[in-house]
Amino acid sequence: KKRMTYQEKQEWASIEGDIEALENRIAAIEEEMQANGSDFGKLATLQKELDEKNEALLEKYERYEYLSELA
């Protein structure tokens, strides 16, 4: 069985917090989008950030799964 490198151990120690922070930011963006429903410029900016955060979250989930197999 493959073992974690030092860097992977560091990442494993912080990844749950990273995921939680991303989930919280996504929820905040979604609330902000509802509050700015008629401001299309603001909505476009928020949607771009939301897409980026969702993509980052997906990558963190995949990384979490990989690291959990090594733990």
List the predicted regions and their residue ranges:
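Charged, heptad-repeat coiled-coil alpha-helices that serve as long linker/dimerization "arms"
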Residues: 1-71
